[in-house]
Amino acid sequence: MAQRFITLILLLCSVLLAPHSAQSSLFGENTSFGAKNSQSRFIPVDQAFAFDFHQQGDQLNLSWQIHPGYYLYRQQIKIVPQQAALGAFTLPEGITHHDEFYGEVEIFKQQLTLKIPITQAAEQASVSVTYQGCAEAGFCYPPETRVIPLDVVVAASTASGTAAVNSSATVNPPATTQPEGDATPVPSTLPFSPLWALLIGIGIAFTPCVLPMYPLISAVILGREKPHSQRRILILAVVYVQGMALTYTLLGLVVAAAGLQFQAALQHPYVLIGLSVLFVLLALSMFGLYSLQLPSSLQTRLTQWSNSQRGGSLAGVFAMGALAGLICSPCTTAPLSAILLYIAQSGNMLAGGGTLYLYALGMGIPLVVVTLFGNKLIPRSGPWMQYVKEAFGFVILALPVFLLERVLGDVWGLRLWSLLAVAFFGWAFVLSLKAHAGWVRVCQLLLLAALLIVARPLQDWAFNGNTQQNAVKHINFQPVANLPQLQAVLAQAQGKPVMLDLYADWCVACKEFEKYTFSDDKVQRQLANTLLLQADVTANNAEHATLLNKFNVLGLPTILFFDSQGNEITAARVTGFMDAAQFLQHLQNTPAVTK
């Protein structure tokens, strides 16, 4: 018994002493261990975002269990039905996350659950669910698309008017993964608060096409026999404004609903650029370059119809207000068109209807005041009304800057904001020169100070741009589009080691690599004798999926190294972000990469 016990102790000691040498013999010469270790920090997408779904009659339930240290982008979640119609649903509010390259975005952590009503589903109906997320450690997964088969759902007679909703969300059955080409975030809310529409409406009321008409409109509202009760006058004025607000609200809902059906397409760079051009043209009409309004024949017909209503009655006044919303003057057409275009681009029905309602309410507040108190509180007409109109031209010009910022990035976005601010303060300063009051001199000094402050980004661009460009020299990569092209380049590498950078616009850490790591002088010198390739897999199409699957790439950033014979040096693979010092150390520890 004692002998067996001693033998057991000796065996245990041998096991405890063995691991170091055993590990050396097992993995010391195995190059694939390095690649496996480089990816061990990150888990497969199915584990990072564990997805489950089930259908209960006319309801589809989607849920995600998000691994600690990982997150999903709210704006990247999309749901598209095929041969089915979905009822209205909304994504829950996410956690605000600041991104250096994309600004403020919303993300989901830990868990996400969606309940989506199904109004109709034919045989072989399905729902495509797309999502995309990242690891907090600096690693992003390509957009994932899953196809969920649906059971048949017969449309109810009461739901015949329900429209299909193409929205956004997530799924993960591994057998039906499909690459998704469009991964552009779709904003679900307006960057402008709808309350701004109230202020814009009040401001539009003081333009030369609107303010002089208010005394006439108030007389029409009250009718031939002016009511003696102030309460009655207030009710009539408010009813008129509500009629006008109804028209604008319906316009907002219709335009937002139309935009919702094409929400993803409206985020395409070409569409954003086209909308920006339209906004600029609308702004030019506010500066007096041309007049924009409804055809005169249509305006005349609407005016006659409005005049046929009986003033002084609630129904007649409400109808006049509703028709007045359709009669756009040159001062109101451009702002209204700009708001409608922007609402269509956002696709948010609640914000769309609310924004137009507040806009009409803002225009109606001065009218209510005029109707109650007469012309006493109306400012005297003059050139200042034209200046108000021109000021709203600058407000409209802010919209294309918002849209172009998504296409051009933060750097050029800041320059566009600076250019717009310089134009506005310069215009205000020139106007102030026409006044001679003493307090205007103080305003002029403030305007000049503001002009210098807002011009700073343009100054940096003009005077420091060349210096910064010379100081920060980015690596010039040779692009490769697919696996056959990569194999051809490797075959013609002429004995040089090769580095392949897998890049995508939706990969935040890829942009960090470009900005902080590849721009480093020491890193560039270390890679001087290396053939540098880059594959842009932003579109995530079939060719890109083939390339990523060939090298078992989980996500980005991933950097592959190949020796002079075109074989991957798996131990040198980089997965996840490395700063310049870490990447340089990695290169120096792998002599075969940069020999």
Curated annotation (Swiss-Prot):
It is a multi-pass membrane protein. GO terms for molecular function: electron transfer activity; protein-disulfide reductase [NAD(P)H] activity. GO terms for cellular component: plasma membrane. Residues 452-592 form the Thioredoxin domain. Pfam families: DsbD_N, DsbD_TM, Thioredoxin_2. Keywords: Cell inner membrane, Cell membrane, Cytochrome c-type biogenesis, Disulfide bond, Electron transport, Membrane, NAD, Oxidoreductase, Redox-active center, Signal, Transmembrane, Transmembrane helix, Transport. The chain crosses the membrane at residues 197-217, 233-253, 270-290, 311-331, 332-352, 353-373, 384-404, 411-431, 435-455. Its EC number is 1.8.1.8. Residues 166-186 are annotated as: Disordered. Residues 1-24 form the signal peptide. It is found in: Cell inner membrane. Disulfide bonds join C134-C140, C209-C331, C507-C510. PANTHER family: THIOL:DISULFIDE INTERCHANGE PROTEIN DSBD (PTHR32234:SF0). Required to facilitate the formation of correct disulfide bonds in some periplasmic proteins and for the assembly of the periplasmic c-type cytochromes. Acts by transferring electrons from cytoplasmic thioredoxin to the periplasm. This transfer involves a cascade of disulfide bond formation and reduction steps. This is Thiol:disulfide interchange protein DsbD. It comes from Yersinia pseudotuberculosis serotype I (strain IP32953). The gene is dsbD.
